[in-house]
Amino acid sequence: MGWHVAKVGDRWAALEPIRQGMTLAFGSIAPKVALGVALRHDWGTQYTANTFVNEIKCWGFTDTPAFVGEPECNGCAERFMRTLKEQCLYLHQFRDLEEARAIIGAFIAQYNAEWIVERLGYRTPAQARREALREAA
């Protein structure tokens, strides 16, 4: 999965990190490239929009919205967003979108490389991903 900073959080903005993730994981954005991959999201309007639903279906994702009223279904993502807000967003007043992208990008890179996460067995996200990919191979 990628990340994206935009002024408007619409369905187009919601699709961008998915495009980034597909390119990184599969080398391209193409129909059915993500077959077998489940995409968990909440019930925000950007994720329920026909454009969003049709795009992820075309790419082969299994659409798995979180259960209404049960944020723990999406707990890892929700916890990361809380950390991002508390450790990055609330500490800065960005001059513009470019500065926001630079600072947020640096935080995400540091988080993935250095942040020890209990849920991941006290490993960094990068370590957990490498080990998961190695086990899947």
What does each of the following model-derived ranges do?
Residues 1-137:
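Charged DNA-binding/catalytic regions of mobile-element recombinases
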